[in-house]
Design a protein with these regions (language model features):
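Polyanion-binding surfaces on beta-sheet-dominated domains and ring/shell assemblies
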Residues: 1-165
Length: 165
């Protein structure tokens, strides 16, 4: 962990920014008021998709924190507007794939991270041609795969949260 060195690596700083942007998109900041919620994301067994796993798990932690603020009377209602999930996709050996494992991610020709809300709207989209450039059609195909994956993750989040925020 970077905290042991008291310094963030560039990769950790980028992940931190992505997670922060993604989670802020879920919240009505005015309703939250003058509060800070710290979400610490440790991916204990990262096998590719660390950034998006941090977003998806971080959202559950955020929802639980907001629920506690409501239960303890600090907020009248939850400031969360939307569920947020993130998933990665890529092109490996010319084949579009969802949720790449490390062995696939390390040889991906194209890598894409997609964060969405439960309405299917894109919050963050990061795509990189690792071994080659990619076409708009390929990007759209990867985004469709990510939308499917995000819908599956949304079901898991709702189940973990008892179906409510």
């Amino acid at each position: 962990r970077d905290i042991a060195k008291l310094k963030l690596s560039p990769r950790s700083a980028e992940i931190q920014r992505l997670v922060g942007r993604s989670l802020r998109a879920a919240v009505d900041m005015q309703a939250l008021g003058e509060r800070t919620i710290n979400i610490d994301c440790d991916v204990l067994q990262g096998d590719g998709g660390t950034r998006t796993a941090s977003v998806t798990g971080g959202f559950v932690a955020l929802a639980l924190a907001c629920r506690k603020l409501v239960e303890e009377g600090y907020l009248g209602s939850t400031p969360i507007r939307h569920f947020v999930t993130g998933v990665s996709a890529g092109i490996v050996d010319e084949q579009p794939m969802l949720d790449l494992q490390y062995s696939e991610d390390s040889r991906a020709q194209v890598d894409l991270n997609c964060v969405m809300n439960e309405l299917g709207e894109i919050i963050e989209l990061q795509g990189t041609g690792e071994g080659r450039a990619f076409t708009l059609n390929e990007q759209q195909e990867l985004v469709r795969l990510c939308a499917k994956g995000n819908r599956e993750l949304l079901k898991i989040q709702k189940e973990a949260l008892g179906g409510k925020l």
